[in-house]
Amino acid sequence: MLQVKIGLIVGLAAPLFLLTGCFDSDNKTVPLAENDNNRIRLAMLLPPRSGLTPLSDDAFKLSRWSTAETLLNLNDEGNLTPALATEWHRLTPTAWRFQLRSEVLFHDGTPFNAKAVVNALNTAATAKPKPRILDGVDLTIEADGEYSVIVHTATPDPLLPQRLTSPQLSILSHNAYGDNGVINPINTGTGAFVLVNVHGTSSAQLNRFEGYWGEPAKAAGIDVSFVPDGLARASALRTHSVDIVEAIPVSQAPLLDPNLVHEVPMPRTNTLYLNTRQGVMADPAIRAAVRDAIDREQIVNTVYEKRADIAQGLLGPAIPWAAKLRQPIKHPTPAGHPNGAIITLATFTDRTELPEVAVYLAQQLTQAGFKVRQVVREYSQIEADALAGKFDAFILSRATVLDSGDPVAYMYSDFSCKGSFNIAQLCQLDIDNALEKASELPAGLERQQAIMDAEALILASDAAIPMLHERVIQGESAYVRHADRDPRERTLISNQTYLSTIIETSK
C-alpha cells in the first residue's frame, strides 16, 4: 500500500473538483478538501420532522450523531452491552433494576443520576402518543438510591432491557424538558458530541464534548446537512464537499469510486404476501406454484443492480444469528397448476424500486401460467385495501426488527391470527403457538431458536415469500476512519470516528 502525505497540497484540491463528475479509476489519490479542523461533514437523507424530540424517529439522528445516549446498547449480534447503565438484573417477572454510571455529566454540566433517568423515562412513558417502542407497554420508574433505578411493567416483559436500547428512550438532562411539553436536545445529552445549533431542516452543528465519560471524540465536531435529493448527496461525495453520506441511491453508486461506497445489510426484507383467506391464493397448491415461479436472482441483478441479498428466509444477514439456526423448510403442499388463474398483484410507488419489482414478478408469474393484473398506487392510497385482503398478492419492503432489535413483534404483527398488519390474512394455530412461545422467552439462544422455529412454520405456509434483503449504501471519503456501518441505523459517527491526513491507496 502507498501512503501519501496530503497536508501540503490541500490548497490545490479545489480546482480539481471541477474537472469531472465521475471518478478516474487510474487516479490513485485525491487531495482532501479544505477541512483542517478535523470536523466531519455529514449529508443526511431526511431532515428533522419533529424538532429533534427523542420521542420521535428524530431520535435516531441524535444517536447517529453520538449526542444522546441510552441506558443500554445492542452489539452487532443483537446482545446487550452497557452504556449509561453498567448492570441490569430482573428482580421479579415485572421489575428490573439498573445500576447507573456515577461519573457522567450532561452537556449542560448537570449530573447524570437516578433522578434524571426517572424524569426522562417517565416523560416517555406518559407521552401522548408514546414512543412506538412502548406501544402496549405500561412502565413506572423509581429511583433506588442516587445511581440505581427500578423499572416496573404492568405485565412480564422479558425484553425490557432491549426496549431501553431504543434511541427514543435516550436520557437527556432535566433542562431538556420544557413545561410546554417540548423537548430540546441542544446542550442536554451525555454523548461524545454536544449539539450546539440546529438550523431548521437545513443543517446542524455539534462539537466535541470535552467532559465525556468515555474516551473523548477524536473528531473536533460534526457539520450536518440535510439533503433529501439522492443525486445531490452522491454529487457532494464525488466533489469532496462532504465526508460521510447517508443512503446513496443504487443508480448513483456506479458513478462513484467503489472505494468510497459501502453496502450495509438492512433488517428489511422485500416480501411477496399472498392472500390465504380468499381468492385463488387460498389454495396452498397455488401459493406453492407462485413460490416456485419466482426468480429472485433476476430481480436482485436487474432492479437492485446486485446490491441486495437473495432471501433464504424472512430474516436476512443483518440478523447474524438467523442463518446459523435456520433449518431446511419442509413444504407440505406440492405446487399446483395455475391453468390461467387471474391474480391481482399490487404494490406502491413510495419505494421507487417496488413497481419495477412488480413488472418482473408479473412476467415470471405469467410464464408460470398465471394471468396477472397489476395495481400500483401511493402507499397511503393502498394500505387499507392491502390490509382488507383485496389483493391476491402484495409486494412489501418490510422491516423485520423493530426498535428492540427482536423479530417477534414483526412476526406477530404480520402472521398471527390477531396481527394488526396481517396482509396475508394468515391464521394458523401452530404459528400462533410458536410465536407465543418465543415471546415468553428471555433474550438469548433459546429465544432465537424459537423465533427460527416460527419462521419455518410461516415459510411452510407460503403465505409470505421472501425475495431479497435490502442494503443501504453509505458513502465515505477516503479520509474517513472508523465510521459505523450499522444495519439498525442507530450509530454512524462515534467517538472513534475521525478524518485522517494520510490516505492509503492501491499501487
What spans do the regions from the language model cover?
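Extracytoplasmic/peripheral linker and loop segments enriched in polar/acidic and small residues
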Residues: 23, 379-382, 412-478, 506-507
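N-terminal lobe/hinge region of extracytoplasmic solute-binding protein
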Residues: 43-92, 122, 188
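Gly/Pro-rich hinge or "lid" segments in bacterial periplasmic/extracellular proteins
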Residues: 164-216, 221, 231
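Periplasmic-binding protein-like
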Residues: 277-319, 356-357, 458-463
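Structural transition elements
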Residues: 305-339, 349-356
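Surface-exposed binding/hinge segments that line
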Residues: 97, 132-175, 197
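Ligand-site clamp/hinge motif
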Residues: 209-255
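Long beta-strand-rich cores associated with HINT superfamily self-processing modules
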Residues: 474-507
